[in-house]
């Protein structure tokens, strides 16, 4: 490889694949996809410092999965070129599902390494709310987590909270202000999650940003709508302070009612993130009675520190988080009996299931399939409610079954307070009058850009979407920041949006051991009531690290960007894209090799189920001095094996899989026996073979030598490998069951390790390769040569040669000989300068050609094209092989074979018959 690399006439295009070939012998055009390595090869020094800090470990392909490598890696020390590669397989499901695109795999990977502050930096590249979202996010990411298909989803939200809490406990350092590089001022109206997220993104881009908040403190519904036992003020304050420290100015007690005010102050773009603060009414009699409270008003008063007096009996109507929060707050304020009434079933409650469970645990009663129809009062004061029972009917527009009242099922409840939590709406009175609204009362904006009917004015969050979760509001703020940046920079607001993340297509779960998801420690029940102390206590360091290690690293590279910090050559480029390169070549040599037969499909051999059943390639790496064990042979538990069985013809010479002989298995199985004899001289070695095929120079002599060395040869195909013992000597062993055809009896051979000599089979993409290079395939799937004896390296496509195991299984000497032959053929064509073509090519009579183009699609050699000017098909004689497909299918009879005209053929037939 080193000689190839240093040869001045050889250009190595690694990490590349041919995607299209056109033209003909001597004049091929090849399109090559050069995959993104994410490394500038001209800068990379191969120092491998990047892999040392990479937190992601993956199975090493070079060591056949027996060891690990990093997501940024050099495959092996002698790799050519000796440059790193970043393994990116798409975006992980958690990141794709997150509305804000938070890189969960990135911070989880760093947590697994104990790099907690670095993990927090990963979250802050996207948003400033690790502590907030670590507590109140609806964690849609967890519902898509691939780990859930193994045991339970990753505790993504909890891990995010952990790194935020870790910084708070360690003492957060003040953030360094971001330099303002832009002159255009931006105003943000509303300091909720949407407004702060928008401000955060814009200040990160260098804009001077001011946030206007009507209430005394920043935070919006995060502060005034979520109780402290779920979101402590110190956590929210810390993250708002972080945004301030970066350079965002926040003005509280400053309502904005006219956009012109902001324009007059020099603001060139405005974002409205004022939320949905108005509680919806039920529209039932007596709803305005004293003692009826709206949930948002109730929570706002409590969170503001105002005195709130409740009676002993409180009913909350609704099934969302606001309803559950109100019920749990009522208990903490001293209510003796708190009941949630919800008109649908328990499973259809939109509140987080964990919050509902905790509410019940604290003593909240949940009355499902019921709905208040009337508020009972005396002298204007609430005394009770009248409800009706419901049943579920046909699905409504939301897809849920519609609740239908049951006639005659009315009942009453005596209560002291009723808290309404059935929905929220936008407060239009607090917004500028010139804005346009939708039929649902929310602000009307462009669905892609977030721009309102007024140019330069954008909106997002609940004021646009209606009541939604925090992370949706954060995402809206981020999208608005992108739009504002484009607007102020004079760039098209819509181009390239919305951006679609390419989700990783397949995540291997092979060999993943089930582990219990980390449980969240909870505050004792007796410490909750009468107190607003946080209920969820958070994970400790050890638990967080162990939980993070459960991650499957779906996308390989987590894009944590730790590698950038240590690369002194600045060779890493995570934004690199693949290239399509076109090259002109005269000939093509196809040497795509083979793939190893997957022995796990032969279930009875136990590969993938028993740790000490390995393939031949895996043992090759185990026995190599550069392998994962430095050449020492160990079992999975660290012991050295005392007995080893080597099974021949696994997947080959088998009617159920491949009928052909793989040719190399016998010899490498014998080589393994010799290596084992050297490394483990006292071990018992068994060779289980059908026929020993040692056809090569010195091969038979080597076979005889191993017989003399004491290797046990048993003629017969193994029927099963099991760990079920039938005698004391089989305890703790693998038992190979085989019929010894020489002595005609079944044998049970207890061994410590079994090595499977697997078949060589065509690569999985062989069909695609065949289409690209116009190759034919044999019945066994390997590429078909032009003639097995007279032309074993050429194909039916002139100038295209096949060599090595892609043509048929063969050993290294035969592969080298075939490769040399193909090289000689290619060089001969170059030196000669001309090629001989088939004499019997097809010819098109342009007068008869109808231009139907049927022949073009049928030609297996792509020899026919269409002349747009003449409107007829034409044949390239240099490519045509005279196969006759086009002649037989031409509906107008315009195509004939040269030297095989219709007149000639008819005359020949007539001569035979007459």
Predicted regions and their residues:
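Beta1-alpha1 glycine-rich phosphate/pyrophosphate-binding loop at the start
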Residues: 1-6, 70-71, 93, 99-112, ...
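FAD-site-proximal beta/loop scaffold in flavoenzymes
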Residues: 60-82, 290-312, 395-467, 509, ...
